[in-house]
Every structure is written in C-alpha cells, then in structure tokens.
C-alpha cells in the first residue's frame, strides 16, 4: 500500500486522509495503490501532543502491527562515529575514515558509518582493507548507499545499487563477504506504493545477508 498523510485543511475546517502527491518520485509511479483480494488496508494513526515528546516517544505504529517477517539473524544495535556530520563530503577519504575508526575504538563504540561518495573517493577494493582495519580495532562498518532508481537524479554514490533486486543482492553479497554490518540508504522519492515496496525489498534482502538498515531521507515510520 502507499503511505498517507493528512490533507490541507478543507472547507469546514476538516482534514482528510490523502494519498501521495503526483509529483513525488519525480512524477513517476501511481498515486492510487492497488492490491489483490482478499486484502486489507493499513492502520492509520494520529498522535497528538502539546509538545514533541509524545510524538517522538509513541510506539503506536509498532503496537498495531503484527510482524510479517521473522529475521534470520540476531542484530546488535550500538553506538558509532560518523565523520560526515562534522566534516561532510571532504571527510570521505581513507585517512579520515581511519581516524574515525580509531575514535570509535577509543570511545568503546561498536560502529563507524562511512557516508556518501565512498565508492569513488575510497573505492571497493580499498574499502576492503579499511574494513579489515576497522575489524582489527573491534569496530564494525556501516556503508552509505543512494536508493537510486529512475525517480532519483542525485549525484552522490554509490548509485543504482539498491533499486534493482538483482544488482542489490549482488552488492549485499559483497557486503556480507566483507563483514559489513549494515547500510544507510538515503534519498527516497516519496510515499507511493512503488517506494513502499522498495523499502520492504531492501529490508528483506538485507536480512538475507545479515545487514542492519538505516533509512535516511525517507518516510516516517510505517510499522517495520
């Protein structure tokens, strides 16, 4: 199904449940969802509070959903270092990432997140040695990817690795072989049904390869 939202206020100070806007995903894909019968539509919830606290802390999205899948791996959440938040694109090079691996090790953190452009500024082959270095320090690695696809024209790479199932599985196989523990997937195009399917496809394939997933530049929590 697609994601939904509250519409702008209508006559009589009413709000309605609205489907995605046509221009989402650069205008590609359908606005109206479809599914085979018998079927059911998702829960729709609204959280209201005088402050942001109840909105941030609510668990209702997960409380009303029965899990559709069982994970095949045990995942360990943890803390990590992330150079991009301070030094941004210029920090995505081998030497600076070694520094952030060392920082994670010194802090007793479990992970380091290496952000966009690593595929060109470090490269897959040199990344393998960086992953080995991090693991030698007791630090595991997350790598960034663009969600890509025909709806997405951003330049930051790696691109075109997550939208096609065949290419995605090939890339995740490489990640698993290197001992990468997770991925950060960024720049999603909207809330149309096609994008909801992409989220689920990424999550399912990631679990097949023992990878945790961070979604960034994405929809609000949908009960996954």
Residue spans for each PLM region:
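Sequence-level detector for tyrosine residue identity
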Residues: 1, 15, 69, 75, ...
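Amphipathic, alpha-helical segments enriched in basic
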Residues: 20, 24, 79, 109, ...
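Sparse, context-dependent recognition of short Cys/His-centered cofactor- or disulfide-binding micro-motifs
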Residues: 28-32, 66, 97, 168
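An acidic-aromatic substrate-binding cleft motif
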Residues: 37-111
């Amino acid at each position: 199904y697609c994601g939904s939202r509250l519409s702008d206020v209508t006559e009589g100070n009413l709000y309605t449940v609205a489907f995605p806007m046509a221009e989402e995903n650069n205008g590609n894909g359908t606005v109206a969802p479809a599914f085979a019968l018998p079927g059911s539509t998702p829960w729709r919830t609204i959280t209201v509070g005088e402050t942001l606290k109840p909105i941030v802390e609510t668990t209702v999205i997960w409380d009303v959903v029965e899990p559709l899948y069982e994970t095949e791996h045990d995942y360990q959440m943890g803390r990590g270092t992330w150079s991009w938040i301070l030094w941004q694109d210029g920090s995505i090079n081998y030497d600076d990432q070694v520094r952030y691996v060392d920082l994670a090790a010194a802090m007793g953190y479990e992970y380091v997140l290496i952000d966009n452009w690593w595929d060109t500024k470090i490269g897959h082959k040199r990344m393998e040695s960086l992953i080995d270095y991090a693991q030698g320090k007791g630090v595991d690695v997350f790598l960034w990817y663009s969600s890509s696809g025909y709806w997405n024209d951003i330049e930051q790479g790696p691109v075109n690795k997550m939208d096609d199932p065949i290419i995605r599985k090939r890339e995740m196989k490489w990640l698993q072989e290197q001992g990468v523990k997770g991925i950060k997937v960024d720049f999603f195009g909207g809330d149309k049904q096609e994008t909801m399917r992409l989220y689920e496809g990424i999550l399912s394939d990631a679990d097949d390869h023992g990878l945790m997933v961070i979604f960034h530049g994405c929809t609000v929590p949908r009960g996954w």
